[in-house]
Amino acid sequence: MRFKALLRAIFRFRKTNFSILLIITYAIIIALLVFDRSRYKLDLPNATSDKLRRNLLEQAWSDLQVITQSPHPYSSRNNDVVHDFLLQRVKNITRSNDNIYIDDDYRNKSSILFHQPDVFNSTSKVSRVVYYESSNIIVKVVGSNNELPALLISGHFDSVPTSYGATDDGKGIATMLSLLNHFSSSQPKRSVIFNFNNNEEFGLLGAYAFTYHPWIRDIEYFINLEGMGAGDRAVLFRTSNVETAEIYKKAVKSRPFGNSIFQQGFNSRYIGSQTDYKVYDEYGLKGWDISFYKPRDYYHTAKDSIQYTSKESLWSMLNQSLQLAIYISNEKLIKKSSSNPAVFFDLLGLFFVVVDTKHLFYADIFMLIVGPILLMMKAHLDKRRRLERSRLVQLRLLLSLGLSVVFLLLLTKSLNSFNPFVYSADYRTPLTGLFLLFVTVNYLIVTLAERLNPTESYKTVAINQIFIIAWLMQLYITLRMAKSDFTLTGTYPLSIFSGCLIVALSLGLFGTKNKAVNDAPNSSVRYASSQNDEDNPLPSQDRGENINQVRDTGNQEVTSNTNTDLHSNAEEVDERMPLLSNNHIGDSGKMDKNSDFSKHYNWIVQFLCIVPISSFIFLFSLDYTLDAIHKMVQETTDDVQLICIIITIGVILLALPILPFISKLNYQSSVIIAIIGVLLFGKSLVMQPFSEIAPLKVRFLQTVNQHDISKSSVSLFTAKDTPIKEMIYDLPSVKSQSTLVNCTVFGGSKICDYYGLPPNLVDSEGNRQNKNLMKIEVLKNDNNDTQRSPYAPLSAEIKINVSENRVCSLAFWSQSSKQSPVKKFSVIKSNNNNTNSVSNSIKYADGIDEVLIHKLDFNGAHHFSIEWLPNIPFDLDYDPVIDGQGDNNIEITVACFTGEADSLSVVNGHPLKKIPAFDEVVKYSPKWYTFTNRDRGLVVIKDKIQL
């Protein structure tokens, strides 16, 4: 009997029991989170037992070291160095294999001219045409079964001008070389095609170029390898549908890592970047986007280098890609009839879960229907049991939750006022502090209400009301799911939470049969404060229990303390018993001994149904989301608001599972929680938002003044309220020349302009001012032809000469037309016999606003022609002879981009940095700054012409 009494004491709904269980639950969840985030560091293949994979990793690491020796954007000569290295590596790997074919776009002089919407801004209405000369290296490993469609593996070898490209996308390229090495020695059943593509960074152009290659017609599946962070683990960002998600699940048995929350981030455009996955997906291929996703403040900066990454990080991509590629290339894949998007996530890298979004939609509808039915049944049974709960009890959770939300909003607002960029340095500290304070306020309000109006029914009422809140959220999500054609793949945590609540409600209803607890008419039994549980930890068989029995008589409430002996083994009769029970008090006043189960275990079963699973899913999902995007606060203050909204919603969702039980939190635990919450929130208020390991990323662009190169303006872009102006005034060149710094705020961003050190863009002797960097020649202009018919299209032929340049843009503007009058653009190339001919031409009836030109020749001119329509007034009486011709003039703004970090020019025999202004901000700014490019190059040369 002593053992039985001990068990009852352990599992009673007591403050100590609940507090211990809550602490254990969160300790386990946090330990699992730490384990999940750091486990990849322990996963390197063993050099003895797994020699083959270890050799692949070591070779990939060596390749990565070579690729990342210097920045290598498409516009640089180092880009050609990387291209040549890759081509030679591919030849060395495949030299002894007759089933492998290599195609080099550089050698083939492949080029494309096409109309392209803005891939990074889906809301842009700019009509853009792109001319691109490709240097992709394409390799085909012919499979043994020609009937199987091919697999494409793609990655890009260019970097941005400010980055060494270790993660973006050197690891992807090194992984591809290792995969090619594997398939060259082990012929796959399915042909595998590798696209080592160029110029992904500024338009996904290497992938677009591949869509014009004849081999793409053989492909059905693709794996895109990308880096949108600068290290850590590679994640399955997105995949085409349920079929491809299931393939990943079957293929990647060792350390799967993916979450469809990232996929929804792309679909909803919360993630502004894009990858080549977009191109292949729009072409109609089915595939996987495997990418690194953090840290974003190293992304596209000099810290995206070998120094700041690791073999463990490289292996996380190589391991997933190798498993997936081997499985796809050697299996006859079974196609599913469903092409719906998939909800997917891994569990600690041990299991991978895949759910059809339409199936999740049906499950949500089922829960939306079943939930209210359960609540109505519960209300009916409460009525039969004559349980009458006062309105104060009904309002208790709503009051505590409402006041806590107001308090939470005040805290986040104060944090934004005092330290808005703290989330960039550490989002977990403010998140934890806000969560603990939110729980503390709920605890205080509920405890105070318990003292004023004691009740044992709070848990049940709170579960019901939280389910109603979850039901409303689920209804909103389900309606959005239907409108979005089932593309909402990141809302599954709410579905899991609702499912947990329904299970908890069902246990209360269907655990046992229904009997009235008290047959006395118009009576209800209520306990005094729940603190009484602490007073009698081990109830005696010889002792009755003190019951605060309340009877309603008209409008009067009569209370009497009665020492009632229900049974020698019985304890309180209270709301902790299930609603449907075999264990009841009959007319004899006796209770069945089986009531002990419902009395002592009901709350703990409900706790285990709701809290661990929901808290685990909410915490992991929230941490993944914030881990990926918390650095966005550096972009604009609008992103600060977005992060705050996510944290606020996340805190509420994290707290909801424990609120029904919060009244049983003991005093000691509540004090500790409050103290830790205050300390963490206080730390968040004073924490330095930027540091060497969590730097502020600033975007750089220098605009050359051709008339006076010493007046070349430097523009630094960052979020509003960052201390960028003070840093600029501390630069040696600014101080020595007393240069003015002009900062302008637009939206949530800030741009600061000043005259920086002049660039050294080309090798030169004598005057180092680099005059005539750009020369625009108009070779032909019909607008000046007086014999031209006023109704005939106008045309012009133009040549732009820019030394050491590959990339230019043209913007067309006409004062007389809202829409661009330019309808045709043609690229003109020189032939071997010194004659010119049109190599590519495109017409676009809606008008061309902008043309981007990418050529591989550094010193050749940008030579092109355009056609535009004359301005003809919409007047039937219009006569061009009498009234004269309309305004047919157009303005062309030419911008040519050049320059990459660490590059040199020889001026008067001395090697000098090409962009000393950039070198200056890197060298003399505090160590918690890091810099990246604002545009296609670090330097832009601009000019205008009128036609």
Curated annotation (Swiss-Prot):
<feature type="binding site">
    <location>
        <position position="226"/>
    </location>
    <ligand>
        <name>Zn(2+) 1</name>
    </ligand>
</feature>
<dbReference type="Pfam" id="PF04389">
    <property type="entry name" value="Peptidase_M28"/>
</dbReference>
<protein>
    <recommendedName>
        <fullName>Vacuolar membrane protease</fullName>
        <ecNumber>3.4.-.-</ecNumber>
    </recommendedName>
</protein>
<dbReference type="Pfam" id="PF22250">
    <property type="entry name" value="PFF1_C"/>
</dbReference>
<feature type="glycosylation site" description="N-linked (GlcNAc...) asparagine">
    <location>
        <position position="319"/>
    </location>
</feature>
<feature type="topological domain" description="Vacuolar">
    <location>
        <begin position="691"/>
        <end position="947"/>
    </location>
</feature>
<feature type="binding site">
    <location>
        <position position="300"/>
    </location>
    <ligand>
        <name>Zn(2+) 2</name>
    </ligand>
</feature>
<keyword id="KW-1133">Transmembrane helix</keyword>
<feature type="compositionally biased region" description="Polar residues">
    <location>
        <begin position="522"/>
        <end position="531"/>
    </location>
</feature>
<feature type="glycosylation site" description="N-linked (GlcNAc...) asparagine">
    <location>
        <position position="801"/>
    </location>
</feature>
<dbReference type="InterPro" id="IPR053975">
    <property type="entry name" value="PFF1_C"/>
</dbReference>
<keyword id="KW-0926">Vacuole</keyword>
<feature type="binding site">
    <location>
        <position position="168"/>
    </location>
    <ligand>
        <name>Zn(2+) 2</name>
    </ligand>
</feature>
<dbReference type="InterPro" id="IPR053976">
    <property type="entry name" value="PFF1_TM"/>
</dbReference>
<feature type="transmembrane region" description="Helical; Name=2">
    <location>
        <begin position="359"/>
        <end position="379"/>
    </location>
</feature>
<dbReference type="InterPro" id="IPR007484">
    <property type="entry name" value="Peptidase_M28"/>
</dbReference>
<feature type="topological domain" description="Cytoplasmic">
    <location>
        <begin position="450"/>
        <end position="458"/>
    </location>
</feature>
<feature type="topological domain" description="Cytoplasmic">
    <location>
        <begin position="663"/>
        <end position="669"/>
    </location>
</feature>
<feature type="binding site">
    <location>
        <position position="201"/>
    </location>
    <ligand>
        <name>Zn(2+) 2</name>
    </ligand>
</feature>
<keyword id="KW-0378">Hydrolase</keyword>
<dbReference type="GO" id="GO:0006508">
    <property type="term" value="P:proteolysis"/>
</dbReference>
<dbReference type="InterPro" id="IPR048024">
    <property type="entry name" value="Fxna-like_M28_dom"/>
</dbReference>
<keyword id="KW-0482">Metalloprotease</keyword>
<feature type="binding site">
    <location>
        <position position="156"/>
    </location>
    <ligand>
        <name>Zn(2+) 1</name>
    </ligand>
</feature>
<feature type="topological domain" description="Vacuolar">
    <location>
        <begin position="413"/>
        <end position="428"/>
    </location>
</feature>
<feature type="topological domain" description="Cytoplasmic">
    <location>
        <begin position="511"/>
        <end position="601"/>
    </location>
</feature>
<feature type="region of interest" description="Disordered">
    <location>
        <begin position="522"/>
        <end position="573"/>
    </location>
</feature>
<feature type="transmembrane region" description="Helical; Name=7">
    <location>
        <begin position="602"/>
        <end position="622"/>
    </location>
</feature>
<feature type="transmembrane region" description="Helical; Name=4">
    <location>
        <begin position="429"/>
        <end position="449"/>
    </location>
</feature>
<feature type="glycosylation site" description="N-linked (GlcNAc...) asparagine">
    <location>
        <position position="121"/>
    </location>
</feature>
<feature type="glycosylation site" description="N-linked (GlcNAc...) asparagine">
    <location>
        <position position="784"/>
    </location>
</feature>
<feature type="transmembrane region" description="Helical; Name=3">
    <location>
        <begin position="392"/>
        <end position="412"/>
    </location>
</feature>
<feature type="site" description="Transition state stabilizer">
    <location>
        <position position="299"/>
    </location>
</feature>
<feature type="topological domain" description="Cytoplasmic">
    <location>
        <begin position="1"/>
        <end position="15"/>
    </location>
</feature>
<keyword id="KW-0325">Glycoprotein</keyword>
<feature type="glycosylation site" description="N-linked (GlcNAc...) asparagine">
    <location>
        <position position="742"/>
    </location>
</feature>
<feature type="transmembrane region" description="Helical; Name=1">
    <location>
        <begin position="16"/>
        <end position="36"/>
    </location>
</feature>
<comment type="similarity">
    <text>Belongs to the peptidase M28 family.</text>
</comment>
<feature type="transmembrane region" description="Helical; Name=8">
    <location>
        <begin position="642"/>
        <end position="662"/>
    </location>
</feature>
<comment type="function">
    <text>May be involved in vacuolar sorting and osmoregulation.</text>
</comment>
<feature type="topological domain" description="Vacuolar">
    <location>
        <begin position="623"/>
        <end position="641"/>
    </location>
</feature>
<feature type="transmembrane region" description="Helical; Name=5">
    <location>
        <begin position="459"/>
        <end position="479"/>
    </location>
</feature>
